[in-house]
Amino acid sequence: MATRNSPMPLGTAQGDPGEAGTRPGPDASLRDTGAATQLKMKPRKVHKIKAVIIDLGSQYCKCGYAGEPRPTYFISSTVGKRCPEAADAGDTRKWTLVGHELLNTEAPLKLVNPLKHGIVVDWDCVQDIWEYIFRTAMKILPEEHAVLVSDPPLSPSSNREKYAELMFETFGIPAMHVTSQSLLSIYSYGKTSGLVVESGHGVSHVVPISEGDVLPGLTSRADYAGGDLTNYLMQLLNEAGHAFTDDHLHIIEHIKKKCCYAAFLPEEELGLVPEELRVDYELPDGKLITIGQERFRCSEMLFQPSLAGSTQPGLPELTAACLGRCQDTGFKEEMAANVLLCGGCTMLDGFPERFQRELSLLCPGDSPAVAAAPERKTSVWTGGSILASLQAFQQLWVSKEEFEERGSVAIYSKC
């Protein structure tokens, strides 16, 4: 738990390969003896130049090269579309702005997020983001790099076909692979089996994985996550007398990261004298505001979503229900012993300890063990970086030639 009166920084922030049993796990690099080189494959430039890993999230698109420990680029998933009615005749400025381009314009913009609760709803914006990643951020020629793209749990199967069409037809990449975000997350832990509990900005999932196989029939989803926590914090602050609006969400996001925490025993926190909870926060205009119980009350919505108007169960209940659906005793024990937290929303101070307590109360006979890796905010990307670096994985790239021969369904042959 965060120290209640510790000084806080002031200001605002800137902003399934192969068949079952054949998937190369994260420890394959320790076992790999070069057997994959005996495969009859045409040599491609893709093996000589590092692959690109792209994890498109609701808040940021994380990207970088395979083999790196963490993503190099964090690109906002918000795209700015210029308003046609505001443009003068002969205006040659860009109509779509991404990343740092959004900071350097005075033109009226319509802000669009291409994802809703983790699912792509605007493919044009996805194309705009990827174009920015290749040409502006990474400054690379996409036709020279294989690309691994993450796909959220329970997403429409057509998503993978659309990813393939965009990458091969629009960007001309030589090879690609699409795989489950949850599978990549578990690889970041160095495991191939476990219960992945991931909560990012727009959606949360509880996903059982057995020896590299994602089990969608046992997977649970909740349409709340870090973005909803931010909105709830703004509601609490306004109830305390402030006047924040959606235009201030970046400030609220920073307050959440720097001042808020999950209380291990919220009843005890409520009994503290105000002075033990209060911290001052300096707004960009220099004004100081005091934040009290809102610091821990906001995180309660992850355990009681009804506080923020949701009818879905809290994350511990969602996880306990998933364990309850595991009928095989040995499998259930394995899942309970490997509950893995992933995603930025789980980075809140005190959350792992509180989650462990709540889950243990709900599943006393299962002895659940919760793990929280320090870099779990980027667990999906890191898992992709590990996977794409393995020699045993190289046979699982879908080539441009395969796409041209079979169309977008070629993606299902290896993904």
Curated annotation (Swiss-Prot):
It comes from the Eukaryota. Pfam families: Actin. The keyword Hydrolase does not apply. One of its GO terms (molecular function) is structural constituent of cytoskeleton. The keyword Protein biosynthesis does not apply. Detected only in the testis and, to a lesser extent, in the prostate. Residues 1-31 are annotated as: Disordered. Its main location: cytoplasm. GO terms for cellular component: actin cytoskeleton; cytoplasm; nucleus. Keywords: Cytoplasm, Cytoskeleton, Phosphoprotein. It is found in: Cytoplasm, Cytoskeleton. The modification Phosphoserine is found at S6. Belongs to the actin family. This is Actin-like protein 7B. It comes from Homo sapiens. The gene is ACTL7B.
